[in-house]
Swiss-Prot record:
Pathway assignment: One-carbon metabolism; tetrahydrofolate interconversion; Amino-acid biosynthesis; glycine biosynthesis; glycine from L-serine: step 1/1
Catalytic activities: (6R)-5,10-methylene-5,6,7,8-tetrahydrofolate + glycine + H2O = (6S)-5,6,7,8-tetrahydrofolate + L-serine
EC identifiers of the protein: 2.1.2.1
MF term (GO), any: glycine hydroxymethyltransferase activity
Protein name from the UniProt record: Serine hydroxymethyltransferase
Function description: Catalyzes the reversible interconversion of serine and glycine with tetrahydrofolate (THF) serving as the one-carbon carrier. This reaction serves as the major source of one-carbon groups required for the biosynthesis of purines, thymidylate, methionine, and other important biomolecules. Also exhibits THF-independent aldolase activity toward beta-hydroxyamino acids, producing glycine and aldehydes, via a retro-aldol mechanism.
Any one GO biological process: tetrahydrofolate interconversion
Matching PROSITE patterns: SHMT
Known cofactor(s): pyridoxal 5'-phosphate
Compartment(s) where it occurs, according to its Swiss-Prot or TrEMBL record: Cytoplasm
Binding site for (6S)-5,6,7,8-tetrahydrofolate: 113, 117-119, 238, 346-348
Amino acid sequence: MKCDPSIAKLINNELSRQETHLELIASENFASKAVMEAQGSVLTNKYAEGLPNKRYYGGCEYIDGIEQLAIDRAKNLFGANWANVQPHSGAQANFAVFLSLLKPGDTIMGMDLSHGGHLTHGSPVNVSGKWFKTCHYEVDKKTEMLDMDAIRKKAIENQPKLIICGFSAYPRKIDFKAFRSIADEVNAYLLADIAHIAGLVASGLHPSPIPYCDVVTTTTHKTLRGPRGGLILSKDEEIGKKLDKAVFPGTQGGPLEHVIAAKAVAFQEASAPEFKIYSQKVISNAQVLSNQLQKRGISIVSKGTDNHIVLLDLRSIGMTGKVADQLVSDIKITANKNTVPFDPESPFVTSGLRLGSAALTTRGFNEQAFEDVGNIIADRLLNPNDEDIKENSINKVSELCNKFPLYSENI
């Protein structure tokens, strides 16, 4: 990037940060070189409004082939009858669903944000909470898991037009079949937002929502390890036609075909047997991390995990998420403060710290390494004012980063 040394320097600095820090943000992962090559290709030059073979621009004969390949691979990977690969993000995918299935003022029901839901599931600060009436279900106070009987009662009381099952900070499996039964009882559409667990679903390590849900949305990064983007799936091709129109021209203009090509590459990677092995390690590594932190006296929401998410409840050690976030950041561990169920703190402070295993598993971290990471985090959080432990932790992080390099060749 000789033409722009300022940007080149910042990109190199970011690469160095990724290489020298432990990435534990649950929504992040490391894309392959092949994915990045596709996204950084000449496809960024091409406008292609419309769908394959139904474009509003000329010169799309190769673009059509790329997008159709992405569609076919997505359908095969998830066992869907229909797919749209154009959404720029998971939020855009959800907006398209709302536009196609709802009218302003309809009621939607999703998981409460402070209990692990997402902004686009009816939060008052999001369009989903401004255009629609909302009601939210929570986790059980004792188990910190979903209580399907309580969710059923909430649905009957509020009669939502759309029920959303999905999360951004819930470490347990979702019973899509039970959600389907509730949706049928109140005559509601059922949307599964699997942004966090898409890679685990694709690998067969989490139950699939496709047989039970009217629509499924996801991002294409996180556990799926592709480019940052969105995807919509359905078993119902008639609903799919509505969704196509809701994506374009309903909520977006021209698709990002260079990103769609990168999605196609990621779908191909996720269909390989090696990806299932990777996904199994994502789960087992998260469980090792969860177990080690609990051994050190740090509470974990729901007392464990079935996926890549480990959510620390720091009330057990008298600490806020904001403080913990800074403490681990000081030793080159990247995480994020997060609310926990029935959190007394504000979203800007929180009582939780959210961790995820996907990115470090991509680097090759094994169970022993994750046990080490758990001890490093516990040492720091339990001894926040000990400078010797802080310096020792920084050295241990550096040793792990050198042992498990991010990219084995220049990018």
